[in-house]
């Protein structure tokens, strides 16, 4: 035994080392893959940063090189402080169940503080450990929980950041592709170039958006190599320019040159900051795409590959420009002029490919954030297509895709130059960063339980830097910065109107729900004819009987033998574990055959198709019946208060299919003697554990459930028409009767309802006076 123990002790370090090597190997693989998904945008920023900073008459390149050295110093420290320190070292730690982004920060705060305005929220907040500086935190928490106006401001702030991300999804493809194609300017005659650049840019953009429905997984394997080649290319050119033109350019990394730059250029230098801040565009993607990778992989990729390559690229451009002062045209202050002439065509091709990769990442991120907003009732329902069977985050939204394409082409054709496009993108980028800084300061106090002074230090330090850039971008309102403001205003109106209407609809349902006593007093037959089958009544309520049901049975007194009130909720967490997805309860005595099922999805979860959903639903109800709910699971104990107990069903009773496959791991199970055959379905049986003690009453209820499933399942969907009640204000009538109704008529229904067979669906119309 001693020898075995000694051998085990000696082997343990070897196992730990092997696991560590495997972990590092997985992180390195993810880091490599993240180059193509996360860093395409920030990697292409050298194409237009210097060109945007020197655009117009804000600053001029002089023989003393104060301007170019000052711009390089600002670029270096902005990239270091914002991208490296703020995002990589701090913000990446604030993940919401592994997910990132502006809305993830908002949902994280709402779960720790009861500050959510979303109907049918997630319930109690998560337990938080530690109470450091509890007095200051409790005061801040109490204010957010007590004052409804602060909750609304918090939601509006999160929506502002979301709208600017959508605006960035419009502007980034235009800026990146247009800047990449601008390399043709130095490779062909000017007379030919002016007829080529715009059509080529538009053709690439149309092709980019037209191919979205194929999904990034089909060409994703080449994304990382393209970005790797691009980063290697710009860093090698940077090293060449530093060695060949000005190897003392590293001195410009000193903050002293920022002071000299502002001292000499004054107002012009401050206004040029709007172009300099584009060096950090794409930094938000590191946080937004956190769900697809890990913190360690994103940190490894940025700190070891992306950051050094970008610094070398910016230093190389500055080294070349510092030795060339006789530029005839402004476009010479840019990327391609610093590329050796023999390499311009290959670099041009790589740049265009890298710009497409960067644009793809932003477009996919826009799809993801709109899906999050739609899941949390902050955006009208849209069609969501999952383009990958393995990576759930890869989605495609047709309506949003074509809207983005039209807007992207509109700004490209409207501005026709990098200056105005860059001004527009700069304001969108810095606004999102400001929102992230403010929300992050709340996370530090409320979620991490750190000192409020630490949060204030974070807010003041990074907020001051970003406010400086924000002010420089805002003064360019008439030179392109009005575009993201206009786009965000339009999307903000859409989101606020939809959210307001959704809340009013939920409040109407809640206030007009029917008492459970009314239903129980009808008797086991509910006072109506009970026909074979399962009836699913969709409701937003987690308790009580929806008014739509009483409206239905009053006009058509017949219903199914098994009645299920189905509530599908999106909760403010990224993912809900399968064993926690279904909550099942019983309404009234067993002979009524009334059940309530609440199905919970996270804002990043993928909802199943109708066959899988129906199968899981019936299996969960069957497991609820088998588990002996009459004692403690889901019995309606206090009908006056409509207090129902719901049970979380971890694993439903699996179904044995006709071809011999079992839907769950059920090898040690035996089947009941219940068997059904349906012309439209495979025959199925419940599979019970071998040691299960099933009495005759439970077996009879399971038999009835399977008979009802054999007869068919019908979905009753409420089709509500919102009308502002008499006496409402003029603004409310406009918002509800026109704006909200317009959005409702042109939006998709619930995502699970889209997969329900039309022959099994019945819509019941009802007017809501709100």
Curated annotation (Swiss-Prot):
Cell compartments where the protein resides: Membrane
Transmembrane regions: 24-44, 71-91, 153-173, 195-215, 219-239, 268-288, 300-320, 347-367, 395-415, 426-446, 452-472, 480-500
Record GO cellular component, one term: membrane
Extracellular side: 45-70, 174-194, 240-267, 321-346, 416-425, 473-479
Keyword annotations from UniProtKB, A to Z: Ion transport, Membrane, Potassium, Potassium transport, Transmembrane, Transmembrane helix, Transport
Membrane-topology descriptor: Multi-pass membrane protein
InterPro entries: K+_transporter, K_trans_C, K_trans_N
An annotated GO BP: potassium ion transport
Main location: membrane
GO MF entry, a single one: potassium ion transmembrane transporter activity
Topological region Cytoplasmic: 1-23, 92-152, 216-218, 289-299, 368-394, 447-451, 501-770
Pfam family, one: K_trans
The protein's role, per its UniProt record: High-affinity potassium transporter.
Family: Belongs to the HAK/KUP transporter (TC 2.A.72.3) family.
Family annotation (NCBIfam families): kup (TIGR00794)
Name of the protein: Potassium transporter 25
Lineage: Eukaryota, Viridiplantae, Streptophyta, Embryophyta, Tracheophyta
Gene of this entry: HAK25
């Amino acid at each position: 035994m001693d020898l075995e123990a000694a051998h085990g002790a000696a082997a343990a370090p070897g196992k730990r080392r092997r696991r560590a090597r495997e972990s590092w190997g997985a992180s390195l693989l993810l880091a490599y893959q993240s180059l193509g998904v996360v860093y395409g945008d920030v990697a292409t920023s050298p194409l237009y940063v210097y060109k945007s900073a020197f655009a117009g008459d804000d600053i001029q390149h002089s023989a003393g090189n104060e301007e170019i050295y000052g711009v390089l110093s600002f670029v270096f420290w902005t990239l270091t402080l914002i991208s490296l320190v703020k995002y990589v070292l701090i913000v990446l730690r604030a993940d919401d169940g592994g997910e990132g982004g502006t809305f993830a920060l908002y949902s994280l705060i709402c779960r720790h503080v009861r500050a959510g305005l979303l109907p049918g929220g997630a319930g109690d907040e998560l337990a938080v450990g530690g109470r450091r500086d509890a007095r200051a935190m409790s005061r801040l928490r109490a204010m957010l929980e007590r004052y409804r106006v602060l909750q609304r401001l918090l939601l509006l702030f999160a929506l502002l950041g979301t709208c600017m991300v959508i605006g960035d999804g419009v502007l980034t493809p235009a800026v990146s592709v247009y800047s990449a194609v601008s390399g043709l300017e130095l490779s062909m005659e000017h007379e030919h170039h002016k007829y080529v650049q715009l059509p080529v840019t538009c053709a690439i953009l149309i092709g980019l958006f037209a191919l979205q429905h194929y999904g990034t997984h089909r060409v994703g394997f080449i994304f990382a190599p393209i970005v790797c080649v691009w980063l290697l290319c710009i860093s090698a050119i940077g090293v060449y320019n530093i060695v060949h033109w000005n190897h003392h350019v590293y001195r410009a990394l000193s903050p002293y040159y920022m002071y000299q730059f502002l001292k000499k250029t004054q107002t012009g230098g401050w206004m040029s900051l709007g172009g300099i801040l584009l060096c950090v565009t794409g930094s938000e993607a590191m946080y937004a795409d956190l769900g697809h990778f890990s913190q360690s992989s994103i940190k490894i990729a940025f700190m070891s590959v992306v950051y050094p390559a970008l610094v070398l690229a910016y230093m190389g451009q500055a080294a070349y420009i510092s030795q060339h002062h006789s530029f005839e045209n402004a476009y010479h202050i840019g990327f391609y002029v610093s590329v050796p002439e023999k390499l311009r065509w290959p670099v041009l091709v790589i740049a265009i490919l890298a710009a497409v990769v960067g644009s793809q990442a932003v477009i996919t991120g826009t799809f993801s954030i709109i899906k999050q907003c739609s899941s949390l009732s902050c955006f009208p329902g849209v069609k969501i297509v999952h383009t990958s069977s393995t990576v759930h985050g890869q989605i495609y939204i047709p309506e949003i895709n074509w809207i983005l394409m039209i807007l992207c082409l509109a700004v490209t054709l409207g501005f026709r130059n990098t200056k105005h496009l860059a001004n527009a993108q700069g304001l969108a980028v810095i606004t999102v960063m400001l929102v992230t800084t403010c929300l992050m300061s709340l996370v530090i106090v409320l979620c991490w339980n750190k000192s409020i002074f630490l949060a204030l230090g974070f807010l003041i330090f990074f907020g001051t830097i970003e406010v400086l850039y924000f002010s420089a971008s805002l003064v360019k309102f008439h030179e392109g910065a009005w575009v993201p403001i206009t786009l965000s205003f339009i999307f903000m109106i859409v989101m606020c109107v939809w959210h307001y209407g959704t809340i009013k609809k939920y409040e109407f349902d809640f206030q007009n729900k029917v008492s459970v006593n009314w239903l129980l007093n009808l008797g086991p037959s509910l006072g109506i004819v009970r026909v074979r089958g399962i009836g699913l009544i969709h409701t937003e309520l987690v308790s009580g009987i929806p008014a739509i049901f009483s409206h239905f049975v009053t006009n058509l007194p017949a219903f199914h033998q098994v009645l299920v009130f189905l509530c599908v909720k999106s909760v403010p967490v990224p993912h809900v574990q399968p064993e926690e997805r279904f909550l099942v309860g019983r309404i009234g005595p067993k002979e009524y055959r009334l059940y309530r099922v609440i199905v919970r999805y996270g804002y990043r979860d993928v909802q199943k198709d109708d066959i899988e959903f129906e199968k899981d639903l019936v299996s969960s109800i069957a497991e609820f019946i088998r588990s002996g709910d009459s004692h403690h699971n889901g019995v309606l104990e206090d009908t006056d208060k409509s207090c129902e107990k719901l049970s979380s069903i971890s694993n439903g009773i699996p179904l044995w299919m006709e071809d011999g496959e079992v839907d769950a791991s059920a090898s040690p199970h035996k089947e009941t003697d219940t068997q059904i055959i349906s012309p439209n379905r495979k025959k199925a049986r419940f599979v019970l554990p071998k040691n299960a003690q099933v009495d005759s009453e439970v077996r009879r209820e399971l038999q009835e459930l399977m008979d009802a499933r054999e007869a068919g399942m019908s979905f009753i969907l409420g089709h509500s028409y919102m009308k502002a009640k008499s006496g409402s204000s003029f603004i409310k009538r406009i918002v509800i009767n026109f704006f909200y109704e317009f959005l409702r008529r042109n939006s998709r229904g619930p995502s699970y309802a889209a997969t329900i067979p039309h022959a099994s669906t019945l819509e019941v119309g009802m007017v809501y006076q709100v």
